From Swiss-Prot:
The chain crosses the membrane at residues 8-27, 42-61, 68-85, 113-135. This is Probable disulfide formation protein C. It is a multi-pass membrane protein. It comes from the Bacteria. It comes from Bacillus cereus (strain ATCC 14579 / DSM 31 / CCUG 7414 / JCM 2152 / NBRC 15305 / NCIMB 9373 / NCTC 2599 / NRRL B-3711). NCBIfam families: PRK03113.1.
Length: 139
């Protein structure tokens, strides 16, 4: 497979991940009526613009976006990892008790004993970061 095709598929995959993450986030808050905590809002702030940015980049085949999406997705992943640690690691849970109106330790979902909303966001951010890295490496 050619370099440009790899870049194209990686960029499209990153956009798809951001689109699915945004739809999932909106589903949980608007349909299921799960109120987001403060850290969830920060994750949304980092995730939602990717749908627009990466969508435009896919349409224009502008692979330069990867230079910007990699660090932004990495920051979002760090926030998600911290939020996940607050939920799952006892040493971090004390920090989440006073997170805001909704405690960051709350787990609206807990599929298979480990998949929570911050975990899903973490997977989305990691997918975007890895795809951005692939785009950069194939320049």
């Amino acid at each position: 497979m050619g370099r440009e095709k790899k870049q194209e598929y990686a960029l499209l995959t990153a956009w798809g991940a951001s689109f699915i993450a945004t739809l999932g986030s909106l589903y949980f808050s608007e349909i299921m009526k799960f109120e987001p905590c403060v850290l969830c809002w920060y994750q949304r702030i980092f995730m939602y613009p990717f749908v627009l940015w990466l969508g435009i980049a896919v349409a224009k085949k502008d692979y330069r976006i990867a230079s910007y999406s990699l660090p932004i997705a990495s920051i979002g992943a760090c926030i998600s990892l911290y939020h996940y640690a607050i939920q799952k690691v006892a040493a971090f849970s004390a920090a989440g008790a006073a997170c805001g109106r909704v405690p960051c330790t709350g787990e609206y979902i807990n599929w298979f004993g480990f998949v929570t909303i911050p975990f899903l966001a973490l997977i989305g951010f990691i997918t975007i970061a890895v795809c951005s890295f692939i785009v950069i490496k194939n320049k």
